[in-house]
Amino acid sequence: MTNSNTRTESHFDYVKIKLASPERIREWGQRTLPNGQVVGEVTKPETINYRTLKPEMDGLFCEKIFGPSKDWECHCGKYKRVRHRGIVCERCGVEVTESRVRRHRMGFIKLAAPVSHVWYLKGIPSYVAILLDMPLRDVEQIVYFNCYVVLDPGDHKTLKYKQLLTEDEWLEIEDEIYAEDSEIETEPEVGIGAEALKALLEDLELTEIAEQLREDISGSKGQKRAKLIKRLRVIDNFIATDARPEWMVLDAIPVIPPDLRPMVQLDGGRFATSDLNDLYRRVINRNNRLARLQEILAPEIIVRNEKRMLQEAVDALIDNGRRGRTVVGANNRPLKSLSDIIEGKQGRFRQNLLGKRVDYSGRSVIVVGPKLKMHQCGLPKEMAIELFQPFVIHRLIRQNIVNNIKAAKKLIQRADDEVMQVLQEVIDGHPILLNRAPTLHRLGIQAFEPKLVDGRAIQLHPLVCPAFNADFDGDQMAVHVPLALEAQTEARMLMLASNNILSPATGQPIITPSQDMVLGAYYLTATRQERSKPEFGDRSRTYANLEDVCHAFEEKRITLHDWVWVRFNGAVDDDDEAKEPIKSETLSDGTRVEQWQYRRDRLDEDGALISRYVLTTTGRVVMNRTIIDAVVTR
């Protein structure tokens, strides 16, 4: 970690999450100011003063602990300006520095009694219960002050280590111990609450237990063996991370930086605050009350009740609703605890740390683009101008259309023809990546050549849908622009849709026509027997070439399923080759005309083909024409 002035740059390879020791928690929050004063402990539940609107000292927003609210200004206003950097005000004790330190400086609350960490107690599995080799129900009875636990049986004959005792049972044993004829010399020791739990965890010698468990595992089987392995795994993890089991019981609680749990003033003079402040306030109030009760030597039952309430307050702060009644705020809304902030899709890890937002990307609904080639996609002009804006601006300046970036942006906003022409030049040969979530295999993200289209929907070739598992009922896809030349080359060589015809999982073709395509091909080439077949030479149904048939169809002179005669000198696949022609006639010039069921050939004297007319439907001509256009490069 390197420091330069006030800026801190951290270089690290990974983040490791493990149990923190009480000393480590204090280190997070405790700081020594330049004048030697130690600060960090939050002792008051107050947040801000309602008259001055400044943070209360030693409270949850204390400027002495967390840093000044305003840049280079202390709490009392004695020091203002950057020239006083690093000075600690003699009057208010606030260090003069930047206000952004309030985003990372922590504090801590020193607890008047230990409390158990709810994650390790009530998590699945319960690590506390596994380590102590006790049922979770029994551990909860101890922590929440329902039962005593024997920490040391002493000379008592019936008591055993870790045995649970109710209030009445312990009173009976006490009477027995302090009776005049008692033979017990070493008194049994019992405990209750998180203090007792901490004592039990401190007694654990992890290395010895691990060795013993390995011996027991070798001689056991079935469910007992599985239980032993589970316990050994937890113990091995504790040994590997140099963590102590008693750290699962907290003596101090870290207070996160105030700017991560802000308090904001609304228009009406009211304040909106983070739920964490309410939860911290509950903990501090109960902690202070417990400390006061202990000072005045209050009855044990009152102190015990306050300890239980402190335990519940800390549980709610760490994970509200995990155990007991959920703490609610206004309108009976559950308060968001630390766990709620970090867990789930909207939590700190998945929302802010793992899933980074990507520049040069967009998202839109997909629609079918039947006229596209397989390696092409239709990109809306509105989206393209935004995604390729830096490239367009660069080219506009290079071509001397504008002089600076500001003028280029104004021109782009007007969407002039010049801009569209430059955009077309930019996207020519620049592949884009289309991704459809969830990306379950590598074909879930493929490269395409963009074609500018009107509207706001991305057009996609129907054949690539199976690879994306996409359909056109409202699916959305994300667009990414590869910027580096290497990325563009990789996209073109490896990720282009026309290069990904086979499934990487099975090796079978994944680009297969289905649904509309199969039905369309069938409908196009189907024949209707009820339609009359024209005689050869019928002017309205005889055409010189395939183009003439297509023109007649476009002009609506014929329909898809009408029979037509069309001149076609290519090979014809039919069943007439082995049969005799229906009619054969020799003309005066020596040529011969043969009439077959679906064709009419004119041959010379040597039997060579001069011309051929075939009887087919308009739809089949259109299909044939489309295939020729696709396959033959003209």
UniProtKB/Swiss-Prot annotation:
In terms of Gene3D superfamilies, this protein maps to: 1.10.40.90, 2.40.40.20, RNA polymerase II, clamp domain (4.10.860.120), RNA polymerase Rpb1, domain 3 (1.10.274.100)
Binding of Zn(2+), residues: 74, 76, 89, 92
Single GO term (MF) = DNA binding
The record's annotation in Pfam families points to: RNA_pol_Rpb1_1 (PF04997), RNA_pol_Rpb1_2 (PF00623), RNA_pol_Rpb1_3 (PF04983)
Its EC number is: 2.7.7.6
Keyword set, alphabetical order? DNA-directed RNA polymerase, Magnesium, Metal-binding, Nucleotidyltransferase, Transcription, Transferase, Zinc
Instruction: Look up keyword Transferase and say if it applies.
Output: yes
What family is reported?
A: Belongs to the RNA polymerase beta' chain family. RpoC1 subfamily.
PANTHER family reported for this sequence: DNA-DIRECTED RNA POLYMERASE, DNA-DIRECTED RNA POLYMERASE SUBUNIT BETA
Functional description taken from the UniProt entry: DNA-dependent RNA polymerase catalyzes the transcription of DNA into RNA using the four ribonucleoside triphosphates as substrates.
Q: What is this protein called?
A: DNA-directed RNA polymerase subunit gamma
